[in-house]
């Protein structure tokens, strides 16, 4: 599990491309190396990846076909930067919201509105069916960052970013058309799905022969 509080950004230093498979190497910040071992989990733009090799600050990770298809990690080139967070420990403060590191879809940066001390970014979700889980003032994970949803339309939503978030993460450098990874808040998803099932069951019961309104 992860907290959605990005611990740093890491530069992609090499890519070994194979059919439907990729190994990439990032240069992790020094403060994230303490106790790091092969097999550990590190989120890259919110996507949980497993450490396969450690060579100083250069840490290797394998990406499967499904990861490359669903997330924006397959778009990365050498020299790009990713948000990184090590897996949470039981004693860690949950400064954001609990996140699994399982990306559900991507979203495209559709509009950027900048003022002196904050920035509003609008996103268009690739899988529009997931919009029912994106609620005003609800949680959402964007490239591994725990954020609060601002306004919501049938096809888009926005978040408001303070200077600290813009400085510490890659969102401050995103341009129109850029793809970001999206993780829906699992509690929100569970509530929405449960309500839908209850309403569907009630409607089916009402439509049974002999059922009175």
UniProtKB/Swiss-Prot annotation:
The domain of life is: Bacteria
Q: Which GO terms describe its molecular function?
A: riboflavin synthase activity
Q: Which UniProt keywords apply?
A: Repeat, Riboflavin biosynthesis, Transferase
Entry-linked Pfam families: Lum_binding
Binding sites annotated in the UniProt record for 2,4-dihydroxypteridine 1: 4-6, 146-148, 160-165
| One of the record's GO cellular component terms | cytosol
Q: Which residues bind 2,4-dihydroxypteridine 2?
A: 48-50, 62-67, 101-103, 137
Q: Name one GO biological process term.
A: riboflavin biosynthetic process
Annotated pathway, please?
Cofactor biosynthesis; riboflavin biosynthesis; riboflavin from 2-hydroxy-3-oxobutyl phosphate and 5-amino-6-(D-ribitylamino)uracil: step 2/2
Q: Which reaction does it catalyse?
A: 2 6,7-dimethyl-8-(1-D-ribityl)lumazine + H(+) = 5-amino-6-(D-ribitylamino)uracil + riboflavin
Q: Disulfide connectivity?
A: none
Does Repeat show up as a keyword for this record? yes
- Enzyme class per UniProt: transferase
Question: EC no.?
Answer: 2.5.1.9
Outline what the protein does: Catalyzes the dismutation of two molecules of 6,7-dimethyl-8-ribityllumazine, resulting in the formation of riboflavin and 5-amino-6-(D-ribitylamino)uracil.
Assembly behavior: Homotrimer. Unlike in B.subtilis, does not interact with 6,7-dimethyl-8-ribityllumazine synthase.
NCBIfam families of this UniProt entry? PRK09289.1, PRK13020.1, ribE
The identity of this protein, by name, is Riboflavin synthase
Species per Swiss-Prot/TrEMBL record: Escherichia coli (strain K12)
Could you read off the lineage of the organism from its UniProt record?
Bacteria, Pseudomonadati, Pseudomonadota, Gammaproteobacteria, Enterobacterales
């Amino acid at each position: 599990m992860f907290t959605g509080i990005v611990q740093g950004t890491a530069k992609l230093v090499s890519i070994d491309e194979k059919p439907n498979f990729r190994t990439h190497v990032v240069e992790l910040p020094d403060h994230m190396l303490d106790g790091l071992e092969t097999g550990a989990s590190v989120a890259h733009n919110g996507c949980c990846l497993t450490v396969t090799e450690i060579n100083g600050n250069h840490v290797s990770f394998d990406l499967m076909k499904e990861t490359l298809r669903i997330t924006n990690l397959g778009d990365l080139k050498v020299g790009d930067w990713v948000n990184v967070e090590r897996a949470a420990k039981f004693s860690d403060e949950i400064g954001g919201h609990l996140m699994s590191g399982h990306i559900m879809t991507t979203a495209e940066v559709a509009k950027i509105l900048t003022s002196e001390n904050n920035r509003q970014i609008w996103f268009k979700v690739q899988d529009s069916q997931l919009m029912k889980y994106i609620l005003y003032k609800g949680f959402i994970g964007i490239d591994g960052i725990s954020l609060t949803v601002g306004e919501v339309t049938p096809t888009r939503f926005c978040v408001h970013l303070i200077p600290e978030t813009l400085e510490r993460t890659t969102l401050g450098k995103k341009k129109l058309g850029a793809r970001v990874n999206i993780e829906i808040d699992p509690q929100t998803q569970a509530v929405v799905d449960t309500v839908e099932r209850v309403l569907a069951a009630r409607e089916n019961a009402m439509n049974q022969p002999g059922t009175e309104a």
